[in-house]
Amino acid sequence: MYRYFATTARGLEPALAAELKRMGAKSVRPASAGVGFEGDLEIGLRACLWSRVATRIILSLKKIDVSTPEALYASVLEIPWEDHLDAEGTLSVDCIGTNDTIRHTNFGGQKLKDAVVDRIRDKKGSRPSVARERPDLRINLGIRGNEGRVGIDLSGEGLHRRGYRLRTGDAPLKENLAAALLYFAGWEEQARLGAPFVDPMCGSGTLPIEAAMMAGDIAPGSLRRYFGFRRWRGASGIAELWQRLADESIERQNQAKMPIIEAGDSDANMVHIAQANIEEAELEGHIRLHQRDVAAWQKGADWPDRPGVLVTNPPYGERLGEVVELKGLFAKLGMLLNGPLLGWRSGVLMGDVLWQSAMGLPQQGQRMDLNNGPIPCAYILHGTEPKPQAAKGAPAPKPGLQQGVVSPENAQMFANRLKKNQKRLKKWVTRENVRCYRLYDADMPEYALAVDRYEEWVVVQEYQAPSSIPDADAHRRLQDACSVLPEVLGVPPERVVVKQRKRQKGYNQYDKMANRGQKVLVAEQGLNFEVNLTDYLDTGLFPDHAPMRRRIQQEAANRRFLNLFCYTGTATVHAAAGGALTTTSVDLSNTYLEWAQRNMELNGFKGEHQHRFIKANCMQWIATTDQTFDLIFLDPPTFSNSKSMLESFDIQRDQVTLIGGVARLLNPDGVLYFSTNRKKFKLEQDLLSAQNLHMEEITQQTLDPDFHREPPIHRCWRITCA
C-alpha cells in the first residue's frame, strides 16, 4: 500500500477528491491545493491516466527531518536512490515550501539533489545528470516547518498537458481547470443522459475538447507520450500494468456514446486554432465548430428535446476599451440562456463577478472563487444542484421576509403608492435612460423606508423607527412592503436587498455591514460603475448626486479636477469622461480609493500621472498641498471620528476652515461645488464672504425628479473667488 498526494489548483479539491474515489482510491483526504489518498501501484498509475483535475501525482517515499540544511541532506542520503534511478540516468527535483533555515526553494532543491547524486555515486561509482525537461526521475520535496516529505513525481510533468493543445489565445484555460468547470456544472452526468453541450466563446477549444473527452470516456492521459514513472526503477511490472490500463481505456472509449457537442467563437483566427487543437485531440467529427456571434446561437434542429449544458470562459476585458464591449457580450450570453437555451444548466467563468449582473438572469447563481493561472475568477453556476452551503456572493435573505404574516390591505396601500411613483417617473426614466434612481422615500409615514432601483436590482433601506413605535409593528410594515415589491417592480424576490439605516456615528456610515460581496455593474450616462448592494450601508453610487455628476462632466473639459472625500470616485469618472486634463481623488479610506480606481479602469481611464489617487486626511491635505485646480467637488461626511484621524470632523462646526481651505486651491476662474447631506445645515455666509468667496445655492438644480421632496436630501452651493 502506497501513500500518494495529488496536487491541483486551489478550489478544485472537491472535484479531484470525488474523481479519486470513483477510481477506487482509499483514505481520500482533501487538503489545501491537493488531495491525499492511499492505494496500490495500480491506483497511482490509474490516477496518472484518468485524472482530469490533478496537476501531479506524487508517490510518498519518506518523512524526513528538514530542521536544518544538514539534517535535510543527511535524511535524503539515507534513502536507497540507487534502487530508483540508474547511475547513467537523469533527474530533476522540485522543492515546495520553506522554513527558518531553508529560506528559498532553490536552496532546498539543491540540498536534495546533492544528497541524491552523492548517494548514487557512492554506491555505483558514477552519478546521474540533471535534466530539466522530461527526466528519468523527478523527485518532489515538500517542506512544512521542520518536517519534509520526499516523493516520486509519477506524472513527471503537469497532467494538464494532455498533448493536444498546439496553440492558445490570451489567458488560456488550463485543461484540468476546464475539466473541473465541467464537473461542477454536472456535465459528466448530463452527458451520460444524452444532453447536448455548447460553448459559444470557445477560444482555442479547451472546454469543448475536455467536454468531448469526458462524454466519450476518453482517458485524458491517453495522448501523452511521457510520464515520470516510465523509467522509474522503484517498482517491477510497471510496463505490463500500464499496458493493461491503456487497453482498458481503449475498451471504455469504444463503448461510450458521444452526445452533441457544439462550440464557436466570433474570432475567425480563434476558430482556426480551435480546429487544429480538435484535430490533434483526434476529435474531429465529434465537435461541431462555428464562427458565430453569441447572439446568433439557436438550438440545433437535431438536438434532443431536453435541456443541455453550457460552459464558457468569456474574455476577461483587462485591456482598455474592452469594458463596454464585454457588458454587451455578457448581455448577449444572458439573452441566450433566457431565450433559446432557457432551462439549461450553465457555468460561466468570469474575470469579475460584476459581469454576472450584466447577464440579466432571473436567479442569482451559485458562485465559486477560482483562479485561472494567476487570474482570480468567479465561476457562476445556474441550474445545478445547490451546494450544502450558500454560494459565496449570494445575498442572504433577511430573516422573516419570506415567511412573515402580511396584511393584504396595508400591503396594497403601499403597492398603490409605488405604482403612482412609477407612473410619475416613467417618462423621465425612459427619456433620459435612467438606470439607477429612487422610487420611494418615506412618502407614507407608515412606511419609513427608501426604495432604490439599480438596474435589475432593488435596494430597500429601512429607516430606524422612532422609539414610540414597537419593533413588531415596524417589522410587520416592512413585511407588507417587501411582499409587494417583486410583483409591482417586476423583479424576482432574490433581487430585492433589504438593509436598515440607523443613525450614524462618525465615519461608520462607510463601515462594513456584511461580507456577502453582492457586486453589480450599473450604467449611468454611458459610464459603468461597480456597486455593492449588501456589504455597506451605501452602495457606492449616490443616486441623489446624479445631476451633480452630469454637471461636473459638462464643465470638466481641459480643467484640472479635484475630488475631496472622493468615496468611490464616481464624480472623478464623470470628470475624466468630460475631458479633464488631470484628476486628483483624495480619501482616507484604502477601500474606497481602490474602489475608485476600479471604477476608473472600468471606463478605460488609467495613468498615474493624469489620474492620481491620494490616501490622506482631507483637512490636513488641503492645508499642506501646493497644487491648484480649476474644478473642485467637495462632498464631506456630516461627521467623522475615524480612528485614522487625530481629531473629529463636524461639517457644521468646521465648514469655514474646510471651505476656506479648499477655495485656496482654486485657480482664477475656478469653481468649487460644495454639497452636504446634513439636516438643518446652516451656511456661515458672513464668515465665508469675509474670505472673498461668492456663494450661490444651486440645490434645486442638483435634484432630479426622483428626489423632488421636502426637505431636500442634500444642499449644494457653487462657490467662486470674488
From Swiss-Prot:
GO molecular function: 23S rRNA (guanine(2445)-N(2))-methyltransferase activity; RNA binding; rRNA (guanine-N7-)-methyltransferase activity
Keyword RNA-binding recorded: yes
Compartment list: Cytoplasm
SUPFAM superfamilies (UniProt xref): S-adenosyl-L-methionine-dependent methyltransferases
Catalytic reactions on record: guanosine(2445) in 23S rRNA + S-adenosyl-L-methionine = N(2)-methylguanosine(2445) in 23S rRNA + S-adenosyl-L-homocysteine + H(+); guanosine(2069) in 23S rRNA + S-adenosyl-L-methionine = N(2)-methylguanosine(2069) in 23S rRNA + S-adenosyl-L-homocysteine + H(+)
Domain THUMP as annotated: residue spans: 43-154
Xref: Gene3D superfamilies: 3.30.2130.30, RNA methyltransferase domain (HRMD) like, Vaccinia Virus protein VP39
Transmembrane feature ranges: none
Keywords: Cytoplasm, Methyltransferase, RNA-binding, rRNA processing, S-adenosyl-L-methionine, Transferase
Its EC number(s): 2.1.1.173, 2.1.1.264
Superkingdom of the organism of origin: Bacteria
A Gene Ontology term for the protein's cellular component: cytoplasm
KW Methyltransferase (keyword) present: yes
Predominant subcellular localization, coarse grouping: cytoplasm
Protein function: Specifically methylates the guanine in position 2445 (m2G2445) and the guanine in position 2069 (m7G2069) of 23S rRNA.
Family: Belongs to the methyltransferase superfamily. RlmKL family.
The protein, known as: Ribosomal RNA large subunit methyltransferase K/L
Primary gene name: rlmL
